Amino acid sequence: KLVVKEASRCLACGICAECMQCVAACKANAIDHSMKEEVTELKVGSVILSPGFDEFNPRPLFHYGYRKYPNVVTSIEFERMLSASGPYQGELLRPSDRKPPQRIAWIQCVGSRDESLGRGYCSSVCCTYAIKEAVIAKEHTPFELEETIFYMDVRTHGKDFDKFYERGKAAGIEFIRAKVYEVEEVDGTGNLLLKYLSDDDKPSTREFDLVALSVGLEPSPASVALAKRLGIQLNRYGFCHTNAFSPVETSRPGIYVCGAFQGPKDIPETVIQASGAAGSASALLAPARNTLITKKEYPAEKDVTEEEPRVGVFICHCGMNIGGYVDVPQVTEYAKTLPNVVYAENNLYTCSQDTQERIKAAIEEHGLNHVVVASCTPRTHEPLFQETMREAGLNKYLFEMANIRDQCSWVHMHEPEKATEKAKDLVSMAVAKARLKEPLKPLPIPVNHSALVIGGGVAGMVSSLNLAEQGFKVHLIERTGDLGGIARRMHYTLGSDGVQTFLADLIKKVKEHPNIKVYLNTWIVYAYGHVGNFTTEIMRYRGVTIEKIDHGVTIIACGAEEYKPNEYLYGSDPRVLTQLELEEAIAKGEPDIINCNNLVMIQCVGCRNGEHPYCGRVCCNQAISNSLKLKEIKPDMNIYILYRDMRTYGFYEDYYQQARRKGAVFLCYDPEDKPKVSQVRKDTRYLIRVEGSDPILGEEVAIDADVLALSVPMVPIEEARELATFYKVPLNEDGFFLEAHVKLRPVDFATDGVFLCGLAHGPKLIEELIAQAKAAASRATTILSKDTIMAEGIVSSVNEDICSGCGTCEAVCPYGAIGVNRKKKVAEVNEALCKGCGTCCAACPSGAAQQRGFTTRQISAMVSAGLGV
């Protein structure tokens, strides 16, 4: 306690005493007291702002007891507590007494959706991360945890996030719709008593061992100061101001924005927006492309094929992620005993820049010709170490990685001795393989500098225009007779009435741009090829003539369509409309709509159910948008919105509150007790009766409506499955296209050279699909801007001497990369198409197909090492 108190005093004084204790304590040698502030002048053609965010500090909310009661923590602190490098080494303990909590509560919307704090917006990410923390906490504890999340609305609106919400409920997480108004400590226990009002407006209390406050996102003071220096307009909350049709452009031309500074968002959206901002900047700077590029030079590659293997092993602590559970020094000493290992060391962080220099120095000093790194996942870090190999003059495929974090320390947190022994086995297996590794030479592939964009909606046109403005030829395919897609039916968004003006201008630019060739009434009938060199066969006007288009990349932006419900009298009563149909009717000024007295909206029709288990994402905003427009036309119109959770995330929360102030009535319903709709006769006409339960009143309500609007989701188009087959890209279980990685590659497919954007990826608002369309174009540019690209070296190869030409490999290959040469009667591999999945090697009955980098000999050596034989 004395040490902590002294450290707090020292850090609080704000003046460095130059005691140098921090230098001595820092194992990474990252602190240099001699460094001085420098002012550097850079000449640039564009600026991208991504200064991030601060988390809300809940200390002013005294009723929650943060910093008053030790067992009240923020969600960020709770997540840190779960970390292997956190204060309790990944063990879930209470701060007050270091005992495991049995009952944990999360309080949502702390610092969000609160006008009294000047933070009326929704922070968008808190609901999902609270569920994530609750799920992980259950995984961290060997006993049954009681977990409760107190919420206003569960806003898991991201792609597949609602399924995660359902997974949380299935795991036993309790969700209570309530407003917590006070947290008190129970005398002598450290426990916390939550006082709250549930949705029936009745006060209740519950006792918990630990409380996590789900704090919101806010702009940092430094970001606000930066914006003022740059002359950038901010919104009323201090975030960067943008508009729906240019979501990555600031108020100052040439300066772009991405990430949470533009508005609260999660990692996938942030990465998408970052690529979108880069795409906009690239279009602006296209005339100057490559004029300031300095090509990186590598030393000549050493020929080590005739040398005896000399293996160097580098074992990572990864802070406490590995070192907290695995005895890294012991594993290092073990590695030194393995065959052909001539050098081994351990590092605090092997991925750090200084360790890369150490690896290069060790290669030179000890004559290493093979390198093994035992650390985290090769998915994220293998390219870094392979680059270090090249910089040291070695073939990058002479590198091998052992994953002793994901496959060892993380799954054996409570068994350090066994984790250490397993780490030894994993290192032994990696060394056994590394000894047998051979240099590989990737195949250079020439690049066709044109793009094919599938879909003439907003996403497809924005992608096409961005690529065209960067100087690339674009073939834009649209299966209907008009450009515009579903946006042709849209007239306004929250905050803007200019959808049709924007759309008309976009169509005009696309049609007039010399680099874009538009194909209307055109269908794709077949596609083949590989990254840099695709060929797509098209058919126009459903005719018989087939045309071929050669292109280097493909962007799939084929859109989606509005779901047509088979309930609530839709299709049998013309007064029952979808939200999009209602929007069209309002825009046309149809008297039966704009003059009606009672209008009811039902949310989540056809989604968040067994048929479509995802959230429609845009439906709540559509309902609010139409409500505000109708209230503007006829203020005394009675509008009732029956909802499960109002998901007006981000700054759209302002419009939700505006609709409430203007008199729209919101009634929450339970999915187990959905509203009932029927026709009833009243005097000389039939009305639409909507019946449901009001949890606040605690009784049934019945509304006789003139018009009923159903909030329905977007669903994939039928052609999506055909396109997925042609371009060998996956769909998720809902029929939307599936990205390569939700966070690392959110607009890429696993198939190189094919990208996605727009509603084909999943439901989203117009500003989101515009950002994603620019992101897809930006990612495509990484290929189109090169004359050649290198194929992967780890591909299949065929030993023609023992190949029987049976065709088994051809039948199982998911990429069409291997086939039987009918003249030679042996299989041949197209290395540009091969992704190195190894399916053909596993299926080959003669053993003729071998995977470079994963040969049978190498895999057998790993198995033998793992078994100790």
Please provide the spans of the model-predicted regions.
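Residues forming the flavin
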Residues: K1-V869
